[in-house]
Amino acid sequence: MDKYNNYSNVIKNKSSISPLLAAAAKIEPEITVLSSASKSNRSQYSQSLADTLLGLGYRSIFDIAKVSRQRFIKRHDESLLGNGAVIFDKAVSMANQVLQKYRKNRLEKSNSPLVPQTSSSTDASSESQTNKLPEYNQLFPEPWDNFCRPGAIEALDSPASYLLDLYKFIQSVELDGSNQARKLETRRADIPKLSLDNDALYKEVTALSIVNDVLSGSAREYIDQSGQADKAVNQILGDTHFPFTLPYSLPTQQINKGLGASNIELGTVIQRVDPQFSWNTTQEKYNQVLLAYTQLSSEQIALLSLPDVFTQNFLTQTELSAGYLSASTTEILAEKDLSRHGYIVKAADNIKGPTQLVEHSDASYDVIELTCTNQAKETITVKLRGENIITYQRTKARMVPFDNSSPFSRQLKLTFVAEDNPSLGNLDKGPYFANMDIYAAEWVRENVSSETMVSRPFLTMTYRIAIAKAGASLEELQPEADAFFINNFGLSAEDSSQLVKLVAFGDQTGSKAEEIESLLSCGENLPIVSPNVIFANPIFGSYFNDEPFPAPYHFGGVYINAHQRNAMTIIRAEGGREIQSLSNFRLERLNRFIRLQRWLDLPSHQLDLLLTSVMQADADNSQQEITEPVLKSLGLFRHLNLQYKITPEIFSSWLYQLTPFAVSGEIAFFDRIFNREQLFDQPFILDGGSFTYLDAKGSDAKSVKQLCAGLNISAVTFQFIAPLVQSALGLEAGTLVRSFEVVSSLYRLVSIPQTFGLSTEDGLILMNILTDEMGYLAKQPAFDDKQTQDKDFLSIILKMEALSAWLTKNNLTPASLALLLGVTRLAVVPTNNMVTFFKGIANGLSENVCLTTDDFQRQELEGADWWTLLSTNQVIDDMGLVLDIHPVWGKSDEEMLMEKIQSIGVSNDNNTLSIIVQILIQAKNAQENLLSQTISAEYGVERSVVPLQLRWLGSNVYSVLNQVLNNTPTDISSIVPKLSELTYSLLIYTQLINSLKLNKEFIFLRLTQPNWLGLTQPKLSTQLSLPEIYLITCYQDWVVNANKNEDSIHEYLEFANIKKTEAEKTLVDNSEKCAELLAEILAWDAGEILKAASLLGLNPPQATNVFEIDWIRRLQTLSEKTMISTEYLWQMGDLTENSEFSLKEGVGEAVMAALKAQGDSDNV
């Protein structure tokens, strides 16, 4: 049977063939054109062509007409002995004639109403009926019998018909394919099994979901066969590194995309879900937040931070015997004078060698001893000679002595000498390996004030030494190479040599040629340098430099070239364009860099600047690896870039320096800041010269003006920050230098506060609050594992962001906050106004205010000496002042006094006790009114608040009046310190009360129930703490946004804090009732509140103070903004790079469900 026959039972009986088809198959011998194959076997010609057509599945001429002429001939011409074209043409001709006849018959039938009628038509003449013309609906009547119900599956325009026709069309196309073609049933095995039900036909689904289902099914089959059937498809995609679109984490994408639709980040969610937000957050939590801000999955982070497989230099014994010579290191840093530098060994257990530079040495080389280890952990010791090679070009003048101070190229030379290794012996058990790091180090002062010179590395060169017998294969020398290249580039180690070709590299990495040029900083992306910078390294101004400046290892390609010479570039070779200076080590860096660039969506030169600047701040990262501090810095950058549009150039200048470099066609960032406009006759040039910033005239004053113009600050602000920079850099008093360090410090001090909407002065005040160091930002940041969160630059920036936003929300300023916290203290200078103030209080304490014995001379009080009794029991003092009555929540002063009087036990007569209480209350009110009126008039605070204000600052009405009476000043010199301190405290607390609009109800709650606020240290003092001020603002914000009034809030707190015995706790659980009450106040779901309290670990699960309720309100805000439940927000707050895949998967699905609930189906 022919492969094109789709029928299951072939009709072989000739009598069943259509007569017309038989006629079409009738070919006259004289017009038959036989093929060469037919001529060799003429017996086949006698076979009936009609039987052949039947065998091919054609029973009528219409079956042939359904197929195109070209396809019919291609399929059957050979089977029909070369008559395919003739038979097709005859069949189509006959089919057209039959169709025409059919249409003519239908037209004749449709004209039947025109025939003259003989019944009941006598009113119409026969002539008019005969001459009547046909109408359109008569000529073209609707074929109602062929119609079906609109929307029915069997309709011609239904999805089922379209799908069926499409499916048949694909089958017909596949018939023309070769036997090796992948047919639809192979590519989409689900389609033949698809049930044409209502869901399949009418339910709208995205093309992406179909693609995902198909690909997941295919991937599942492959995974099941690879022995990883226990892992989900998405988990495998995260563990796979090739192609370069992987690793892919669906949960991470869901979380980032879902939260992004609500304009929020995962790091922000983690911050707000943390109960300690935001002043007491631990360093571990900040690390979690910063890594979350990268928006990278744990698999992506793992790929970036994996230990290096290769070293910068792989040296075999043969290469060392010939003498290895490194690239020159003098040209590495443009901003440093490297005329005097050398090479030292990084100390390690398996290495012995020089670890410090030596000023003068008579030895021509140093010996480095390496302990090399084979696969069986057996060791040998190898000695290498290390030399500092200088390339010096003499001038043509004779008798010019060698000048060791001139700039010249320096290179490290390593040599294996057989005489130094007589015991090396047999290497059959090899190869033996050893890793070694060598520093290029410069001479520097130990610190800014020391004369002691020490070695400070500025470049790390990594080596892997392989000692093996002659003829060792590459697989033996680099056994780890094959797995690396297969996993990351899809090639074996042997085939990896193809990556040097530009086309092959682009194919394996998914990069275009122009993208590779940008990556390598070549072609149209060459680095350029500002013309307004004179670099400290003198080699670039001499004839000793044999390379263009700047080079890619200075800017644009620093990371991928490991900050070393012989930078990669594109050259033309016989086989096409190639990448020069490519190595396994650089391929490993390119592997990380290309992926990271796509994940962060940054141009290559900007990402390189970002990475290398961060690495400069990473003190223990001389090898320039992507470490955890680097990743955290990238997270902070991505957050600031998203929220504040901070560019890589700005962020890099914060961590290191303003860059003087750019790529072709752009302006260096340094010039964009300080030379963007021609305001002066000459541009601002970094020439390394010093200037006095205190001068008002001359060239030094011009430098100050240029700096002020570039930073967009006033001269007053500059004079405020200049001493901070001078102190941080150890410069002479009143002096700065036109250098990268100085301008970068000034830029940090100005730009970081501006990012968060603060002035420079306010930013420094805020930094002083956070770090206890005003000039913290003047110093270049340095990451150190020993740093606490109080000194960690990245954490401090996050704190500064949160603190500035909180201050703005509550109408506070950094200056006022510093005063409230006591960080900044104003000088208290006694004045005549103070004397008048205290004299007024003393003079007001007349007999109408102070109690006397006469006040108790009443008939109702006879029988007891109440003056003596009250004085003895510390209710009043000898001067008639009522002693302090400590307030209690829920009790009035009258009740407190009554309890005090009753405790004396003199009389049980309620009438007598009531009279005593009334006398005392009148006196107490008079004394409070006197002091309140005076303080209110002087400080502008509400009179009713004054008694509570005095108690809050650690004093009380009685204490103040007593001090005034005993120490009434007569002049400025007689004002005692306690009274001066009182005026200062009153000023500070008045500022807090007025700024936050605090009423006496809140202050009374603060004094009597500090635990309801959540204060861990409720002690009253003249100095406020940041947690207390923060909780006060939380309370105020709660009151303003509550669904109930402040009394309801107090009632809830009172109910939630009812103390119970253990037996009562067992019998009665008020948690649900508390959740319901709080739900009414917050206008939120009680179940969510109860769940939040349980997640917080409260026992019983009920919020009892403002600290806990503020945390619940933060969850409420997040939940309402994102439509994510409390439980999943809590899980989101626990997400780290080490979290289980199942946890991330659950959170990702919850985020997508919440996004769909918001009606955003496009992003689901």
Curated annotation (Swiss-Prot):
Disruption phenotype: Cells with a disrupted yenA1-yenA2-chi2-yenB-yenC1-yenC2 locus are no longer pathogenic in C.zealandica larvae. Coiled coil: none annotated. Its main location: secreted. It holds the Pfam family VRP1. It comes from the Bacteria. Toxin complex is secreted when grown at 25 degrees Celsius or less; at higher temperatures the proteins are present intracellularly but not secreted. It is found in: Secreted. Disulfide bonds: none annotated. Residues 118-130 have a biased composition (Low complexity). Keywords: Secreted, Virulence. Residues 106-131 are annotated as: Disordered. Semipurified toxin complex consists of at least YenA1, YenA2, YenB, YenC1, YenC2, Chi1 and Chi2. The Yen-TC:K9 subcomplex is about 26 nm tall and 22 nm in diameter with 5-fold symmetry and 5 copies of YenA1, YenA2, Chi1 and Chi2; the chitinase subunits may be solvent accessible on the exterior the complex. The Yen-TC:K9 subcomplex has no insecticidal activity. The native complex with additional YenB, YenC1 and YenC2 subunits is 16 nm taller and is insecticidal; the toxicity-conferring subunits are present at about 1 copy each. Part of an orally active toxin complex (TC) with strong insecticidal effects on larvae of the Coleoptera Costelytra zealandica, Acrossidius tasmania and Adoryphorus couloni and some Lepidoptera larvae. The TC has an endochitinase activity. This is Toxin subunit YenA1. The lineage of its organism: Bacteria, Pseudomonadati, Pseudomonadota, Gammaproteobacteria, Enterobacterales. The gene is yenA1.
